[in-house]
């Protein structure tokens, strides 16, 4: 079982700019395919993609995003409280990677009631999203951007399930389940 740290007790309150914020938490390397998240937001009126993370592909991503101006904001590495403030403000978390392990970032977003859109074929991330309940797993033949748009329309309905799902992965709950497994071996 996996666990995640709790939301910090004190997080900054971010200015409400009346824009629709989507967020991606990722290392900035080619296989994470952040370009797909940029493309998904580029056509949305009043939307902003907050890109949190850094990596050797950052300059290429900044160049790719340049035509979209302030629709894409690169935050680089941020403190835990600031990361959670960005998640709290977000409507969706986008994870367009085609190869991913279990999704800690998915659960961190879910702690704030923020659903994640990711590829079903990405691997372990499919274990951290309950498709159509806590987020969306993009299936073969579906377009990432279209699924993002569809999921935005269901965000409020998914938020309570996302929060409840994330609570399963507190260290306390993870430890309780682990102890139960060990106890069953005796």
Question: Which residues does each PLM region occupy?
Answer:
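Aromatic "clamp/platform" in nucleotide-sugar-dependent glycosyltransferases that forms part
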Residues: 98
């Amino acid at each position: 079982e996996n666990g995640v740290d709790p939301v910090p007790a004190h997080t900054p309150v971010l200015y409400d700019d009346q824009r629709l914020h989507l967020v991606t938490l990722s290392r900035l390397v080619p296989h994470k395919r952040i370009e797909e998240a940029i493309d998904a937001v580029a056509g949305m009126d009043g939307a902003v993609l907050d890109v949190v993370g850094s990596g050797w592909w950052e300059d290429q991503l900044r160049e790719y995003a340049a035509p979209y101006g302030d629709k894409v904001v690169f935050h680089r590495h941020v403190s835990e409280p600031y990361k959670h403030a960005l998640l709290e403000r977000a409507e969706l978390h986008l994870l367009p990677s085609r190869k991913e392990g279990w999704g800690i970032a998915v659960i961190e977003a879910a702690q704030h009631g923020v659903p994640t859109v990711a590829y079903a074929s990405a691997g372990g991330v499919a274990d951290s999203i309950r498709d159509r309940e806590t987020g969306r797993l993009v299936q073969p033949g579906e377009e990432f951007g279209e699924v993002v748009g569809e999921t935005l329309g269901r965000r409020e309905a998914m938020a309570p399930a996302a929060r409840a799902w994330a609570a399963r992965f507190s260290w306390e709950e993870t430890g309780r389940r682990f102890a139960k497994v060990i106890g069953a071996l005796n």
